[in-house]
């Protein structure tokens, strides 16, 4: 065949490909997923995902081939939020106030942050070593209350909500000057040492169980009291930009998340063994299992009591943009659940 004939054949083939919509390979999704978590039993589903390589498994099932999944441990919402918005991670985790704050800041932009699902509903307790403190009204300027991040963490917001109830809405920040930022493991160490300035810790499982097991440490308040019932403690979130660019990868992460949560609920003992091995905690598997079987603890993707926190944050001016429903704060994959 002449050169001209070959050229005509190539042009004809190209036109055929264009007409079939296959002129170029489909947009390739990311080959790496970067996720971050914090410390404690509330992040168990993510630890299960990491340990069993569930995201990698689901990605293969969805035809994405081999992908790399990186996991980071961050100590509070400040670092988590910065990492997500700077593009350093694809999936972030933390408390409900952090999700609401991120959503309010990014709503309507390509970087809009929304929840992928709740990690759990768990009691989050304020514990103290000060024998004179029977309620938050008894704290003085000699007390220091450890929270993961002052003003913005779940515990910091819960303390504000409690203060608003106790001292009046205009005094919601009355206890803020007493708070200090510490990751939960460090806060527990400081509280139990008895030699420092930390006299209270707005804690989380398993740390709060360890703390009240020591003489002189007791619980004076919980998130369930403040919010009027079971409430989501931690959430997984991502950006619309990542989800839109990587729909199959996002779906693989969700499937892995659902699988991990189902596995925990099916065999809590095995899940407790994973937590002990991965965290290096001193608790026995039996002690961890007892915490996980607390009837107030639930591993579920269903968001609960989200709007109560959002309404408070809007009322006191912490956020400028208020969601009209909990569904505004989450991607559609959980919209079919009975959230609140």
Where are the model-predicted features located?
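N-terminal secretory signal peptides that target proteins for export/translocation
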Residues: 1-6
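Conserved C-terminal helix/tail region of periplasmic/extracytoplasmic solute-binding proteins
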Residues: 313-340
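Soluble non-cytosolic domains of exported or imported proteins
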Residues: 74-78, 93, 149-157, 185, ...
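Sec/Tat signal peptide C-region and signal peptidase I cleavage site
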Residues: 22-28
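Short, glycine-/small- and polar/acidic-enriched structural segments
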Residues: 29-172, 177-181, 195, 199-205, ...
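Bacterial N-terminal signal peptides
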Residues: 8-21
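Secondary-structure end/capping motifs
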Residues: 244-320
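Pocket-lining segment of extracytoplasmic ligand-binding domains
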Residues: 176, 185-276
